[in-house]
Amino acid sequence: DLVEEVLRLSTPTANMWRVATRDSKLSGVEIPAGTMLQVRYSSANRDDAQFDNGQAFDVTRDKINTQIAFGYGVHMCIGASLARKEMQVAFRVLLERFTDFALDVDPSELHYPPNVLLRGLAALPISFIGRT
């Protein structure tokens, strides 16, 4: 699924803060109840233990519905369904009207401005050809 894989690999939410509700242990580190934790969505969505070859873009990926680009459970973004629908429409229209998409800069030149909550490119310089 193109939309879900784009969301997984380019998670729009940088992180969220949560409070541990009980004493826990994660990777050998004790986490007492009441500890404030920062959940890095992009790390979770690229975790090789959760997604085979988590750094790779693969629209045929299994278990894609387990990605957490918009959070999870009661904390899930209320606009997630709308955002997904907007992406579906945008990709469909772009593919219907244009061809030969190309990134106009080296990927290393793409810049994500610092933001505590959200993650998005400052610019996406691309070129394409209109369909006739």
Model-flagged regions — what are they?
Residues 1-132:
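Cytochrome P450
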